[in-house]
C-alpha cells in the first residue's frame, strides 16, 4: 500500500476502494496507530493541550501553570491539567499505550510534561498516538530528540556558589534534588566548577541529595549543621529546600545570615516570603511554561524546530539570607 493511499484513507477520501480501505485500516490497527481528532480543532481554533505533572503541585508548578495559561489565553488554546505518579510512567506498555490513545481520542493535540520521569515506554506510546511531547525541566532525557524547555542550571549553580565564595565562605554545602535529575546534576556541576575556580575542596558529606522539598531542607539540613565541621553556607537546589534549611538553623539557635548563609533556586513566592527574604537563583518559570506551550503548538502544527532543547537564562537575586561567614 502506498503512502498516498494511506493518506487518502486517513483523510476520509472517497476515491479508495472498500477492499483497499479495509487493508489500510487493518495495518493501522496492527501498528497501534491512533488518529488524532484535531483536524476540525485546527480549523476552528479549538485546540487542547495536556499539561502533565508528576503527582505533586507546589509553588514551582503554580508558576509554570501560570505561564502556560497566560499564553493559552492569547492563543485560543484550552489546557487540560493531569497528574501522573512515577509508577504510572513505568506501567506496562499496554497501559501506556491506552493512556496515550485516550488523550488522542479526547482531541489533545500535544502533551507538556513538567518535571516528569519520561520513559521510553511513554515516548513509544505518544509517538504511536501522533502526540508531540515537550518536557519542562526533565528529570531525564531518554532520547536526545525529546524536546525540552529548561533554564541555565549550570550557570545558576555556578553563580550562586561564586556569590557565597565572594562573601568569604569556604565551607559551602550543596543540598540538591534527586541525584539522577538532569537539572540537579547541572546545578551540582556548577557548584563544583565554582569551588574549583577558587581551589576550595568540597569536604566529604557536603553534597547531599533530596527531592527539592521543604522536609529535605529540615532533615538533611539538620544533618549538615550537626557535622563536626558544619558548613557556614548552604546552596539549596530549590526554594522549599532552602526554607527547610532556614528552619533547621533556627532550631539550633543560628542566625541568618550572621551564622549561616543560605541560597535557594527558583525564586518562587516562598523565597520572597521567607524571613529573612531568600537569596535565590531565579528561574524564569512563567516564561518556561509559555515557551513550552508555544513549542508544543509548533510541533502539533508539523513545524520543524531549530533546536530540540531550549534553555532560558537564570539570574541571581541577592536578598537577606546571605552575608559574610562568622568570624
What are these regions (language model features)?
Residues 44-162:
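Alpha-helical recognition/docking segments in bacterial nutrient-uptake
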Residues 51-52, 105-115, 173-175, 207, ...:
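Periplasmic-binding protein-like
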Residues 31, 104-108, 167-168, 224-230, ...:
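Glycine-rich phosphate-binding loop signature in dinucleotide/nucleotide-binding domains
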Residues 27, 67-71, 125, 129, ...:
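Alpha-helical structural signal in soluble globular domains
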Residues 1-45, 326-327:
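N-terminal helix-turn-helix DNA-binding module of bacterial transcription factors
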Residues 222-327:
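Flexible loop/turn connectors
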Residues 54-63, 81-94, 138, 149-159, ...:
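Hinge/beta->alpha junction and helix N-cap segments in small-molecule ligand-binding domains
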Amino acid at each position: 500500500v502506498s503512502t498516498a493511499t494511506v493518506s487518502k484513507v486517513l483523510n476520509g477520501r472517497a476515491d479508495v476502494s472498500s477492499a483497499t480501505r479495509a487493508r489500510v485500516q487493518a495495518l493501522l490497527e496492527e501498528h497501534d496507530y491512533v488518529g488524532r481528532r484535531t483536524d476540525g480543532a485546527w480549523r476552528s481554533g479549538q485546540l487542547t493541550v495536556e499539561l502533565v505533572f508528576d503527582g505533586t503541585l507546589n509553588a514551582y508548578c503554580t508558576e509554570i501553570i501560570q505561564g502556560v495559561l497566560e499564553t493559552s489565553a492569547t492563543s485560543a488554546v484550552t489546557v487540560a491539567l493531569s497528574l501522573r505518579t512515577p509508577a504510572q510512567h513505568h506501567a506496562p506498555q499496554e497501559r501506556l499505550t491506552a493512556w496515550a490513545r485516550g488523550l488522542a481520542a479526547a482531541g489533545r493535540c500535544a502533551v507538556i510534561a513538567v518535571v516528569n520521569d519520561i520513559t521510553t515506554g511513554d515516548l513509544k506510546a505518544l509517538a504511536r498516538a501522533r502526540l508531540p511531547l515537550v518536557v519542562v525541566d526533565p528529570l531525564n532525557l531518554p532520547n536526545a530528540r525529546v524536546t525540552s524547555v529548561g533554564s541555565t542550571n549550570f550557570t545558576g549553580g555556578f553563580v550562586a556558589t561564586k556569590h557565597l565564595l565572594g562573601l568569604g565562605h569556604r565551607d559551602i554545602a550543596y543540598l540538591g534534588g534527586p541525584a539522577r535529575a538532569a537539572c540537579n546534576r547541572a546545578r551540582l556541576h556548577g557548584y563544583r566548577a565554582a569551588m574549583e575556580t577558587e581551589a576550595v575542596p568540597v569536604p566529604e558529606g557536603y553534597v547531599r541529595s533530596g527531592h527539592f522539598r521543604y522536609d529535605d531542607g529540615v532533615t538533611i539540613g539538620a544533618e549538615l549543621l550537626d557535622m563536626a565541621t558544619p558548613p557556614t553556607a548552604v546552596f539549596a537546589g530549590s526554594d522549599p529546600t532552602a526554607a527547610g534549611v532556614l528552619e533547621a538553623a533556627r532550631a539550633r539557635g543560628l542566625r541568618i545570615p550572621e551564622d549561616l548563609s543560605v541560597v535557594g533556586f527558583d525564586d518562587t513566592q516562598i523565597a520572597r516570603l521567607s524571613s529573612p527574604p531568600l537569596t535565590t537563583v531565579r528561574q524564569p518559570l512563567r516564561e518556561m511554561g509559555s515557551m513550552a506551550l508555544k513549542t508544543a503548538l509548533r510541533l502539533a502544527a508539523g513545524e520543524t524546530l531549530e533546536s530540540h532543547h531550549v534553555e532560558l537564562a537564570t539570574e541571581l537575586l541577592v536578598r537577606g539570607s546571605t552575608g559574610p561567614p562568622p568570624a
